[in-house]
Design a protein with these regions (language model features):
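Cleavable C-terminal sorting propeptides in eukaryotic secreted/cell-surface proteins
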Residues: 180-206
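Mature extracellular/luminal domains of secreted and GPI-anchored eukaryotic proteins, especially small
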Residues: 1-178
Length: 206
């Protein structure tokens, strides 16, 4: 997950956990406005219920609030550049005219909290899986107005699963391994992400 050497693990945990918990609390208030404990004929769906909606939201929330990251130097084509205008930890910046600096989606993180409170510098994100978003829409009442973007916005916001099992998009429980060719800097991203998953998995399935 996006991190910063100036922020210790305990503080990083608190930032992500508090942010996710506040989002989930707001969602819970909205879900409670629906008839969750009622007869089948009055439910919003016969196929899914509010428990399914809550679980789908937790899985989506964890995928989008704790991004899976790789070093900016990674060339995998499923990665989405982020924070191209920020400086790296060592104070250097991307070369002027870098094409990533011209795209709005490449110049900010998915969450403003990351840019404002963590300031991780440029990195590349393994986008959440499209099916995680689609499952959220299918599982929840229409009154919550969840929707997934379309076209180019979908491609910039969500990734697709690989048929060969490689992790090309982010979802809860995804296993990811670094090979020997990965950089030490990228290892920092991986260790931070693993810590984040440990923290959030325990929270998400309460």
């Amino acid at each position: 997950m996006p991190s910063n050497p100036s922020i210790d693990n305990a503080q990083l945990k608190s930032l992500y956990d508090d942010y996710a918990a506040s989002k989930f609390q707001n969602f819970s208030y909205s879900l409670q406005q629906n008839q969750c404990n009622t007869t089948a004929e009055n439910m919003y769906s016969l196929a899914v219920n509010c428990d399914n909606c809550s679980q789908a939201y937790k899985e989506w929330l964890c995928s989008v609030t704790i991004p899976r990251c790789e070093d900016y130097s990674s060339s995998d084509d499923f990665l989405q550049p982020r924070n191209a205008w920020q400086k790296f930890f060592n104070g250097t910046s991307l070369d002027a005219g870098n094409p990533d600096q011209k795209l709005a989606a490449s110049n900010r993180s998915r969450s403003s909290m990351i840019d404002e409170q963590i300031q991780p510098g440029p990195y590349k994100e393994v986008l959440p899986c499209q099916d995680v978003c689609h499952n959220l829409v299918r599982s929840c009442p229409a009154s919550l107005e969840f929707s997934c973007p379309q076209g180019t916005l979908l491609r910039l916001s969500y990734g697709q699963r690989s048929p060969n099992g490689e992790v090309t998009c982010n979802y809860m429980g995804a296993a990811y391994y670094l090979n020997a060719g990965r950089s030490i800097h990228e290892g920092l991203w991986f260790v931070s992400y693993a810590l984040g998953i440990f923290w959030v998995v325990s929270w998400a399935y309460v």
